[in-house]
């Protein structure tokens, strides 16, 4: 079986997402070593001066939106990473309350692809690294990360949060 060709930074988002779906042998592969290594290579382990991590069973989305709103009202430049998306992939990353264009996501995917070398990443790990890279590029004051299904081994936990909300 031939490997899918690597998309370019200018490839459509749908092409990248299809590529990411087939990149790793497991949809969920808990552990932080792989994703931490790539994040270290990209210097994105501290995406902003202040980081919140939001975890728990219920209310994560509401908590993230509330924090985002309060922090923006106080004059901070804020980024939020959440998952899963409901309609569009671009819902996963917001900066100052707005989704980013697809081209920003595909550019970040190309950066991660170049940095990862032979390290296999899951769809979620790739998406998390993408959010961190986008946040770092935006020079934010605060980042809010919503923990996904992985709990303590979730890819968002590669970032040493200043505040954890449970």
Predicted features by range, described:
Residues 7-8, 12, 26-28, 32-47, ...:
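ATP-dependent carboxylate-amine ligase catalytic core
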Residues 13-24:
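Generic N-terminal amphipathic, Lys/Arg-enriched alpha-helix
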Residues 15, 66, 130:
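Short Gly/charged-rich anion-binding patches and loops
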Residues 18, 69, 133:
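Surface-exposed charge patches
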Residues 50-54, 62-79:
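A conserved segment at the C-terminal end of the G1
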Residues 163-166:
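Conserved beta-strand/loop subsegment of P-loop NTPase cores
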